[in-house]
């Protein structure tokens, strides 16, 4: 089965950006997961790790919840995407 991947073999284009924004805000993966849970998204810190490491595909719903939890526009999560293709 053919799977689309980023140029670096990652399953998403946003994981590195999520990690950078999370670190800029001095949040642990667990704290980011807690923020997402408060928004009604049932995730744990393993979900965050898998996204940041490029192990998990990211849906449009994931992008919206990440943007709300990190208080940034969705476009900010995709800002480095062109370079990774």
Where are these regions (language model features)?
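Short alpha-helical DNA-recognition segment
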Residues: 26-50
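Residue-level signal for the short linker/turn that defines the boundary of a DNA-recognition helix
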Residues: 13-16, 27, 43, 58-61
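A short, Lys/Arg-rich alpha-helix, primarily the initiator
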Residues: 1-25
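Residues in the recognition helix of alpha-helical DNA-binding motifs
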Residues: 21, 35, 51, 80
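DNA major-groove recognition helix of helix-turn-helix/homeodomain DNA-binding modules
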Residues: 55, 59-76
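Short, charged recognition helix plus adjacent turn
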Residues: 2-8, 68, 75-85
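Alpha-helical residues within the helix-turn-helix
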Residues: 23, 34, 68
């Amino acid at each position: 089965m053919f799977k689309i991947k980023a140029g670096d073999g990652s399953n998403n284009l946003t994981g590195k950006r999520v990690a950078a924004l999370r670190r800029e805000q001095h949040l642990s993966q667990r704290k980011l997961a807690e923020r997402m849970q408060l928004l009604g998204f049932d995730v744990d810190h393993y979900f965050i790790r898998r996204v940041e490491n490029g192990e998990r595909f990211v849906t449009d719903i994931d992008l919206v919840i990440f943007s709300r939890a990190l208080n940034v526009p969705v476009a900010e999560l995709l800002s480095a995407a062109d370079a990774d293709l």
